[in-house]
């Protein structure tokens, strides 16, 4: 927790305020459920969910001064749909989405809007760690109604919208950016 406090102290010292905090932490052990160990669970939950709670607290302390701010987390469709080898990450991202709702309610009186963006499969370096990478890519291309895979820009556009004044009354929501893929599951 000290590193989190140090990070936000540095933001405060440099800028004196915080308008938007993007929580894009993501890591996890990709194995079948029966092969998971306690250390895998703890590692993934700490990075993906626990960090949001404590970083969100520190971000909110800075945002309260201006009585405004946006906290936006990145999630994954694995939070609502089964993905092979994705147990720890999927469950941790479900925790991120739940925590998003709790933060949204408790931070609303301070003018802070909290939301999340959940993405479909994106071909990034992280995808190379999936043991079933090729099957995931094939599925994403062939079964996405929009006819193409999601790109990082698709997620960025959703985050930019949530960070804008146009989204001030959106609170505690997870915006799904998947080209319609989860509609077919």
Tell me what each language-model feature is.
Residues 36, 82-90, 102:
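Active-site loop-to-helix junction immediately N-terminal to the catalytic Tyr of the SDR YXXXK motif
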Residues 56, 92, 100:
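Active-site helix of classical SDR
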Residues 76:
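Residue(s) in the substrate-gating loop at a strand-loop-helix junction
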Residues 81, 160, 171-185:
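Short C-terminal tail/terminal secondary-structure segment
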Residues 4, 32-33, 40-43, 137-140:
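Substrate-binding pocket helix/loop in short-chain dehydrogenase/reductase
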Residues 61, 105-109, 168:
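Alpha-helical segment proximal to the catalytic Tyr-Lys
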Residues 17, 108, 113, 170-172:
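Short, small/polar-rich loop/turn modules that mediate ligand/substrate recognition or access, typified
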């Amino acid at each position: 927790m000290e590193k989190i406090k140090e990070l936000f102290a540095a933001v405060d010292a440099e800028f004196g305020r915080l308008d938007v905090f993007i929580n894009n932490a993501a890591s996890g052990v990709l194995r079948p459920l029966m092969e998971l160990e306690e250390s895998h669970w703890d590692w993934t939950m700490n990075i993906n969910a626990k960090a949001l709670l404590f970083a969100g607290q520190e971000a909110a302390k800075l945002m309260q001064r201006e009585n405004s701010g946006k906290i936006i987390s990145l999630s994954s469709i694995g939070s609502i749909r089964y993905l092979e080898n994705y147990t720890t990450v999927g469950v941790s991202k479900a925790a991120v989405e739940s925590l998003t709702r709790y933060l949204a309610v408790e931070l609303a009186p301070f003018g802070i809007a909290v939301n999340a963006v959940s993405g479909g499969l994106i071909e990034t370096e992280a995808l190379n760690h999936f043991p079933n990478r090729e099957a995931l890519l094939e599925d994403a291309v062939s079964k996405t109604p929009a006819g193409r895979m999601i790109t990082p820009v698709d997620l960025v556009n959703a985050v930019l919208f949530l960070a804008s004044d146009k989204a001030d009354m959106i609170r505690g929501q997870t915006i799904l950016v998947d080209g319609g893929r989860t509609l077919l599951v």
